[in-house]
Amino acid sequence: MKALEIGNVKITSGFWKEYQELILKKVIPYQWDILNDKVKGIEKSHAIDNFRIAAGISNDKFYGEAYQDSDLYKWLEAVGNALQVENNIELEKKADEVIDLLEGAQEEDGYLNTYFQLVEPEKKWSNILECHELYCAGHLIEAAIAYYKGTGKDKILKIACKLADCINEKFGPEEWKMHGYPGHQELELALVKLYDLTNENKYLKLAEYFIDMRGTNQFFEEEFIKRKRICHWTKCKVEEPNRRYNQFPYQEYNQFHQPVRMQKKATGHAVRAVYMYTAMADLAYHNGDKELLDSCKSLWDNITNKQIYINGSIGSTPSGEAFTKDYDLPNDTNYSETCAALGTVSYTHLTLPTIRL
């Protein structure tokens, strides 16, 4: 049993209709203004301008973080979903213009990440743990799927597939490839969705590889040593000789402390966790993998019975935006990141039929 597509459901009144209208009429246009730095009093985004630079249209300098591209991709996904609900010529035109920028910025081999293209091109694929290359790719894929479903236009889908193929050439079990997995999970669930749309088995196999490899080697520690123990997020990017990515708390934070089939308790960064659990459950559904499904069920039981607030939020501590221990759900210091709540909704929406109790 799979969920209905957005375009196959029409909400006509009530609570959810009001929120749907709010998103369509107010939120998405406001986000467009933020992405174009038209909202006064807040830090600039520069996300769209970064793509203009990468496409050779602007001579400006990159601004933002290594994950800056994902903000634009998430907006494009929202537009794609909105266009499945109702037509909006103006919104579609804006999105098409952005997609043209993505096409112009993408490299010949499919690589697309404005931070590394513009700031540190020599360091591509050198910091998978911290720098969100694979995370951003996942959000582009999800945006492409939503936009294709909303418009029938396949330009962004071709861009996303080209990037996915680039990643597939870089990661995998073959001896000459990198034997790693995303630092911030997201790509895994996106690849399963891409398989569902294209029926290209290589995308399902790549998602399966990332899930199966997680927690089976010391990939993140090995790449950290290759970088001479320099952390991307440390001020001035200085050497951190005492940091060990093969020890607590870093393994738990990124959910590579155990192979995924052995994980029974939700731990670490809550957003990373539920994104990974979503991919696990979807893979279990596609492959008939009972062992993986049993792990998903145990994780679901742990979250819903012992690590979730009454309002459905998760990730109680601001330290690491993370799960802590069972029943540690304080009200006064509750963090419960919005992304974690959205991840829980996605996890539930996509996978509850698979792990039905």
Language-model segments: which ranges?
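Low-complexity, Ser/Thr/Pro/Gly-enriched N-terminal "stalk/linker" regions
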Residues: M1-D71, E92, D96-F116
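Hydrophobic core segments within long, regular secondary-structure runs in both alpha-
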Residues: W32, L76, E92-Q106, G138-I141, ...
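Proline-centered turn/helix-capping motifs that create local helix->coil transitions or kinks
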Residues: E43, G104-N113, K155-I156, K202-Y203, ...
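Solvent-exposed loop and edge beta-strand segments that line ligand/cofactor-binding
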Residues: A54-L72, K123-C136, E169-H184, C231-Y250, ...
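Alpha-helical junction/boundary sensor with strong preference for TPR arrays
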Residues: E86, Q106, F171, T198, ...
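A conserved hydrophobic secondary-structure block that centers on an alpha-helix together
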Residues: E130-L197
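Solenoidal tandem-repeat scaffolds enriched in leucines and small polar residues
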Residues: Q185, L189-F220, C231
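Conserved small/polar residues in nucleotide/adenosyl-binding loops
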Residues: T348-T354
